[in-house]
Amino acid sequence: MKKDIFDIEMELVGREVYSDRLFLGHFAPTNGEQVVPICLPGQFVEIQVKNCDGVMLRRPISVYAATERTLDLLIQNAGKGTEVLCNAPVGSRFNILLPLGNTFRIPEAGARPLLVGGGVGVAPMYALGCAMKAKGIEPTFLLGARSAGHFSDLSHFDSVGELFITTEDASLGEQGYVTQHSILRAQKFTHIYMCGPTPMMKAVARWAREEGIPSQASLENHMACGIGVCLCCVEPTVKGHKTVCNDGPVFDTTELLWD
């Protein structure tokens, strides 16, 4: 195991519930003297879920935010394992492996980055936006979902950069997909970053390529081990097959065989 990966017992110390299927969990080490390892934008954790029939493997969750004392994870109920996490009361304890994966390349000062997120893919976009703002770069967020009830707290994003929204049912923001939003025609961007459902990212990457804008994507392939051993998350690239958990999850979209 890499020396910079830690195995930490953490307690769920707070919850921000957005729907019956989505919440932001605040975790802290059970050992008060333990410091949360530095987690870079795009990196993720693997949570061990105990006492759940049929769930043997850890669950990968993107890092939303992290400090020396707390770790925030945006968790969506997508199956047995994450259902346990979504229903866990404050005070529940979990073994968490972190930090895993690579990170985004942040542009130089003066850049105009667009951060595109869909579903729980908004989590690494928030972490990235905060990192950019800390370096004096103003990010623009473009977030999409089926309806308004599928979003987390949008005020978090609005406090970091300019925010634009799309929903398929027109319940919030512009109706349609992120690639149909008027902001793509109204403003010029120098860099594109994305995380969300693969069809969404493919469409965004295609648009970015047509516009001649470099783009990076954080992939959401199914993962098991989180350290590149089991090979269940392999993604074909122009440089051969890569493990998303270890070589990624962040890739330059020119590396991906999406066409």
Name what the model sees in each region:
Residues 249-259:
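Short microdomains enriched in Cys/His and/or Lys/Arg
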Residues 53-61, 101-109, 245:
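Short, Lys/Arg- and Gly-enriched loop/turn segments at beta-strand edges
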Residues 14, 65, 165-167, 217, ...:
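Structural signal for conserved beta-strand scaffold positions within catalytic alpha/beta enzyme cores
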Residues 80-220, 224:
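FNR/FR-type flavoprotein reductase catalytic core
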Residues 2-90:
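Ferredoxin-reductase
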Residues 124, 198, 220-249:
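Local cysteine-cluster metal-coordination motifs and their immediate loop/turn environment
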